[in-house]
Curated annotation (Swiss-Prot):
Name of the gene this protein is made from: GT43A
GO molecular function: galactosylgalactosylxylosylprotein 3-beta-glucuronosyltransferase activity; xylosyltransferase activity
Segments passing through the bilayer: 20-42
Upper taxonomic lineage: Eukaryota, Viridiplantae, Streptophyta, Embryophyta, Tracheophyta
Stretches in topological domain Lumenal: 43-371
Subcellular location: Golgi apparatus membrane
Protein name stated in the entry: Probable beta-1,4-xylosyltransferase GT43A
A Pfam family it matches: Glyco_transf_43
Residues modified by glycosylation: 176, 299
Species in which this protein is naturally found: Oryza sativa subsp. japonica
Length: 371
């Protein structure tokens, strides 16, 4: 009797102890699982915001693409000061990009201007090829593409996918152009008007969409303080002709100009006789050399601050022909003209010209209905 009573009293104690062990194991399992998954959670709320696109640290340092399509009835070279101040753009020619690689810190912005002309079916390929080149250039770089308003839609689609920061300018010319050169001249003036109006400070270069560039070319022209020039090789597919034109240099100092035709081996050269000879004219008193737009670059501040570079007037040119004004300044003020690269012995720009295809329309003979 006594033994049976003791066994009956110990059974509730065993049941209680087994329940306690089960509860302990359950709590331990829950804590282990929560601790395991908590280890994969981010340590701060900022990482969650970054992952959701709320401006965290995963955003790129430099904007890759920007579209600015402007359709203008008339282009004026007189800048709008109020618009420039509202845009918050200064007059300095150096842009701090916050990149400490190589210890450079600050680099001048490159303003690459491209005019569009030629056949539309060839234009897309040329723009994409130049875009691939510009993507290899270290920022800051802005690509200014100019063209008539009628072709703006197709070109805008191409530019959006290039990954290059760009400004797309479409304009309606006031006159009908008789030649492709006249149209390109007007487009360059439209681009310079945009650069002046918005105070885009940097080094301006006119890059042909059909041009081929050395990988180090854009790093070289970024070092330009005022004006720079270099040899350019022009290859013509139709005439099978190769011509190299550019400056004669002593180190980085320009001492003359030359033109060499590799087909017949002839070379023409014009050298400066004295330091004061800024315009080496012939007997007739005319300029002995003209410089192609693809063979020079300049500091954009000459457009709105010419007195800084020794020009007597506050306006670039009363005729609003900015590209002509800049070409004259580059040739006249050779004390500020830098040859690129040093001693100008290397060709870094190639221009490839192709003949324009003229499609003749063949008319079918008219047949008269006979009754």
């Amino acid at each position: 009797m006594g033994t049976a009573a003791v066994a009956a009293a110990e059974r509730p104690k065993q049941r209680r102890s087994s329940h306690l062990w089960k509860k302990a194991l359950l709590h331990f399992s829950l804590c282990f699982v929560m601790g395991f998954f908590t280890g994969f959670a981010p340590s701060s709320s900022s990482s969650w915001r970054a992952g959701s696109g709320g401006g965290g640290g995963v955003q790129p340092r430099h904007q890759l693409a920007a579209s600015h399509v402007a359709v203008n009835q008339q282009v004026s070279l007189v800048p709008d000061a109020a618009a420039a101040e509202a845009a918050g753009v200064g007059n300095g020619a150096v842009v701090d990009v916050g990149d400490d690689e190589g210890g450079e810190g600050a680099r001048r912005m490159l303003i690459v201007v491209t005019t569009t002309r030629g056949e539309r079916r060839r234009r897309r390929g040329e723009l994409l090829r130049l875009a691939h080149t510009l993507r290899l250039v270290r920022p800051p770089v802005v690509w200014v593409v100019v063209e008539p308003a009628a072709d703006a839609a197709a070109t805008a689609e191409v530019l959006r996918g290039t990954g290059v920061m760009y400004r797309h300018l479409a304009f309606r010319p006031e006159e009908n152009f008789t030649t492709a050169d006249a149209e390109a001249h007007a487009q360059r003036n439209a681009a310079l008007a945009h650069v002046e109006k918005h105070r885009l400070s940097g080094v301006v270069h006119f890059a042909d969409a059909a041009g081929v560039y050395d990988a180090h070319f854009f790093d070289e022209i970024r070092q330009i303080e005022a004006f720079g020039t270099w040899p350019v090789a022009t290859m013509s597919a139709g005439e099978k002709k190769v011509v190299v034109e550019g400056p004669l240099c002593s180190d980085s100092k320009v001492v003359g100009w030359f033109s060499r035709d590799f087909n017949d081996g002839t070379t023409r050269a014009v050298t400066y006789n004295t330091e004061a000879d800024l315009n080496p004219a012939g007997a007739a008193g005319t300029r002995a050399h003209t410089i192609d737009v693809s063979g020079f670059a300049f500091n954009s501040s000459i457009l709105w601050d010419p007195e800084r570079w020794g020009r007597p007037t506050s306006l670039p040119d009363t005729s609003q022909d900015s590209i002509k004004f800049v070409q004259e300044v580059v040739l006249e003020d050779r004390t500020k003209l830098k040859g690129i690269p040093s001693d100008c012995s290397q060709i870094m720009v190639w221009q490839y010209t192709m003949p324009m295809q003229v499609h003749a329309q063949t008319s079918t003979p008219k047949t008269h209905n006979r009754r």
